């Protein structure tokens, strides 16, 4: 049996393409404020890989970087898709948004990082009901008010 095929991913516009060796080293959900702002979402799911197992296969010149507080985030300069998340304290590791990859990366998220920074509006797993007339859209159905009992004294 040979070496598993690499896992390929890309940004929204397709200008930047990456590949990682299968399997990724780890995966987690990041709820930190910095990640929330970088992704424009309540949290992001990342896969972490050894730097030697990550390759930019297309569009490296099309990456732009933002560096602050010991972290570097690389984005596609054309469409803004987050591509790489690197930290000074772990220079041999590179983290990539899980959403870049349409196929399996070999790791399922096992950790929640920065959960104490999760916003109060983030979805917490409450059961949602289908929204009538909009297939695939779920909503939190308002609770019915109890009617006043007319027979009560």
Regions found by a protein language model. Give the residues of each.
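A short Gly-Trp-Pro
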Residues: 1-153
